[in-house]
């Protein structure tokens, strides 16, 4: 059965009961030339543990874009970072709608079968997964709808296509159900005025060469305006899906777990251990560990009166009492577990360039959360190549942020593994926050690595703060400092409190995790996840403005720290950019890349070439190496055979092997000396031939021609 729905600028075609009929729910969705299959499957047996056993997989099939997978194995293997991040978005959007007590292992799989470069696959995939979930026998109150908002020429655009998004200064992705928002991801997209930039200097001068670039931060009011547009579109989409598919939804006969109450345990703990629990909460405010509660549980279980109670029932009841006390204290007294007021930021300390051989580093500590962020600068060859499904060729990523979360940061003895979804998500958020502050014409590739050394909430925002200062410490000409703060929410019985700079305890027992990053002039990135099943704009407004207050407080501290930064120029890479005739680029490369490989190995530099513009970029650790490589390249391109001669090219037709000349040393380079023979024509006397001599410029020297090749002359000393 097929349904065609015109909604939010898109025509969406759904086929139900056509494919994957043994799944609990399945749809084949078409939009433009894109085709997505979304399926939902669940196990019959519930898990014993108290959590939602949901997994989401998003898979892009190479054949969807007419490609064969690259690499040695010609099939899809582990998911790419882009696939993992999309799966995470779908998970975060749908997870809040699962009913309390649902404990069946459930898997949502979204497969891209055909990819249209103009279609937003993230929005399409979420909506397909939402409809498949709604059609299943899993109880859902209504379908989720996802939309994207862009901003072009100052106007907000609903669901921009991929081409329009290239010209947008905003990328806002919102998911919700009816009039409630469930998940938000936003980033500002910088734009740049077309100014020609040319760098012919070592590192120190590169810093002064910038173009006019706007970070395009959004004000709090602009964000609320965009969210209002998104909310209306989500309501339209959610209603349209419900109207079309409600009659096809499977009857639910799923049994939900009833929360087991232990009134006698609850009364006993509240009457006898409330003081100890409050003390435990104060201890837990300094760590993400629950060891203090475990100690109380052991003490209770050792009593004679409690010998028939299970450890699980005592621990669960303790957790409820703890949660209740934390929330009541915040709502009724305006006081948090660590004694802070609702809008107070934890104490901050900052140290920069503490790693003497790293290009730039910052140790950022906020309360019991500590991030060591290290910046490394590299050449074009260090960029990350990413193969996107809808791009014909791999794209080059020149700004990277890697986030690492070892177990010791929360006191756990766990092995360090490859980055998971959480690490990729936090790194991506920090990258989105910092990217607008970096000049797009900055000639170096940048890699930021955040090592979380201690964690008690807001580690991704500590990464943003430390990352912004690490860039400064590496001499990167960032446009503005960027800081981030995590906001929380406690909502109960129509009373609510918004919390600034939440710690792990408040994240765990709170109702919202709302991360906001930006400069003093506005927001560059935000991310919201809600546990309530929806949030209204009035609470969002308070959270945004309270976040601004906290962000500016943090930025003031960061600005003072930035004034004390001493850039360690000795360890920074050096770079020179110059131009040659574009037709000579092939001479620099040589046959099968032989010449450029020789230059790289000989001088210990990296070289990037722009064939169209004739630009040559040389990067290395020593100015002398770079200058020598540049001279070598200029010598190669100055009189190459087969190219048109310019006014500076010399005629070497009268020179022969074995000819002797009384030449003059015109220039000395690390790889040899250039000796003028006659009529302004030079020959290269290689350094290996003059180790025993102490040459100087303008010195007279008797030489003979040993080689004439590709328009170049090499000479030896006469015996």
Curated annotation (Swiss-Prot):
Reaction it catalyzes: RNA(n+1) + phosphate = RNA(n) + a ribonucleoside 5'-diphosphate
GO cellular component, one term: cytosol
Superkingdom of source: Bacteria
Any coiled-coil regions, as ranges: none
Lineage: Bacteria, Pseudomonadati, Campylobacterota, Epsilonproteobacteria, Campylobacterales
InterPro entries associated with the record: ExoRNase_PH_dom1, ExoRNase_PH_dom2, ExoRNase_PH_dom2_sf, KH_dom, KH_dom_type_1, KH_dom_type_1_sf, NA-bd_OB-fold, PNPase
Transferase recorded as keyword: yes
Binding site for Mg(2+): 507, 513
Species, as recorded: Campylobacter jejuni subsp. jejuni serotype O:2 (strain ATCC 700819 / NCTC 11168)
Domain KH: 573-633
Designated name of the protein: Polyribonucleotide nucleotidyltransferase
């Amino acid at each position: 059965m097929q349904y065609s729905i015109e909604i939010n600028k898109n025509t969406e075609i759904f086929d139900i009961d056509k494919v994957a009929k043994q799944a609990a729910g399945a749809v084949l969705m078409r939009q433009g030339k894109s085709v997505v299959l979304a399926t939902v499957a669940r196990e019959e047996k519930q898990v014993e543990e108290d959590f939602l056993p949901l997994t989401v997989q998003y898979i892009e099939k190479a054949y969807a874009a007419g490609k064969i997978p690259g690499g040695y194995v010609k099939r899809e293997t582990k998911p790419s970072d882009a696939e993992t991040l999309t799966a995470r978005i779908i998970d975060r959007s749908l997870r809040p709608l699962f009913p309390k007590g649902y404990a069946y292992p459930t898997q949502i799989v979204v497969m891209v079968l055909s990819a249209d470069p103009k279609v937003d696959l993230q929005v399409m995939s979420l909506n397909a997964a939402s409809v498949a979930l709604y059609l299943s026998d899993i109880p859902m109150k209504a379908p989720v709808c996802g939309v994207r908002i862009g901003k072009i020429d100052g106007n907000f655009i609903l669901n921009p296509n991929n081409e329009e998004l290239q010209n947008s200064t905003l990328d806002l992705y919102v998911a919700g159900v009816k009039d409630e928002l469930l998940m938000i991801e936003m980033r500002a997209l910088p734009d740049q005025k077309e100014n020609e930039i040319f760098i012919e200097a070592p590192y120190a001068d590169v810093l002064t060469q910038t173009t006019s670039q706007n970070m395009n931060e959004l004000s709090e009011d602009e964000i609320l305006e965009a969210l209002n547009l998104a909310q209306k579109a989500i309501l339209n989409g959610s209603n349209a899906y419900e109207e079309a598919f409600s009659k096809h939804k499977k009857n639910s006969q799923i049994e939900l777990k009833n929360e087991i109450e232990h009134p006698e345990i609850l009364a006993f703990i509240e009457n006898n251990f409330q003081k100890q629990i409050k003390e435990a909460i104060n201890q837990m405010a300094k760590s993400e560990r629950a060891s203090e509660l475990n100690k109380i549980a052991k003490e209770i279980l050792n009593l004679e009166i409690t010998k028939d109670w299970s450890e699980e029932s005592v621990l669960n009841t303790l957790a409820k009492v703890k949660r209740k006390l934390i929330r009541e204290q915040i709502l009724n007294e305006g006081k948090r577990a660590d004694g802070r007021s609702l809008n107070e930021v934890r104490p901050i300390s900052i140290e920069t360039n503490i790693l003497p051989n790293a290009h730039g580093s910052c140790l950022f500590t906020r309360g019991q959360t500590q991030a060591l962020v290290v910046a490394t600068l590299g050449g074009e060859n260090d960029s990350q190549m990413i193969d996107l499904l809808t791009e014909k060729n791999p794209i080059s990523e020149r700004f990277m942020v890697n986030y690492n979360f070892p177990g010791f940061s929360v006191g756990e003895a766990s092995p360090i593994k490859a980055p998971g979804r959480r690490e990729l998500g936090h790194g991506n958020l920090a990258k989105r926050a910092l990217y607008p502050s970096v000049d797009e014409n900055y000639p170096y590739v940048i890699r930021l690595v955040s090592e979380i050394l201690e964690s008690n909430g807001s580690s991704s925002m500590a990464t943003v703060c430390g990352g912004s200062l690490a860039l400064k410490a590496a001499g990167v000409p960032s446009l503005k400092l960027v800081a981030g703060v995590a906001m929380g929410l406690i909502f109960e019985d129509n009373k609510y409190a918004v919390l600034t700079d939440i710690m792990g305890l408040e994240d765990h027992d709170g109702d919202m995790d709302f991360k906001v990053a930006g400069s003093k002039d506005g927001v560059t990135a935000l991310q919201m996840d809600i546990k309530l099943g929806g949030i209204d704009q009035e609470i969002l407004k308070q959270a945004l403005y309270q976040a601004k207050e906290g962000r500016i407080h943090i930025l003031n501290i960061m600005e003072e720290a930035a004034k004390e930064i001493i850039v360690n120029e000795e360890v920074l890479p050096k770079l020179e950019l110059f131009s040659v005739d574009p037709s000579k680029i092939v001479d620099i490369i040589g046959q099968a890349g032989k010449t450029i490989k020789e230059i790289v190995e000989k001088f210990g530099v990296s070289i990037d070439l722009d064939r169209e513009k004739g630009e040559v970029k040389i990067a290395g650790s020593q100015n002398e190496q770079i200058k020598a490589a540049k001279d070598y390249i200029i010598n190669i391109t100055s009189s190459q055979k087969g190219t048109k001669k310019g006014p500076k090219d010399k005629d070497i037709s009268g020179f022969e092997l074995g000819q002797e000349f009384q030449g003059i040393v015109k220039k000395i380079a690390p790889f040899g000396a250039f000796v003028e023979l006659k009529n302004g024509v030079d020959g290269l006397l290689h350094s290996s031939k003059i180790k025993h001599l102490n040459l100087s410029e303008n010195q007279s020297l008797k030489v003979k021609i040993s080689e004439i090749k590709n328009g170049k002359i090499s000479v030896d000393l006469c015996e």
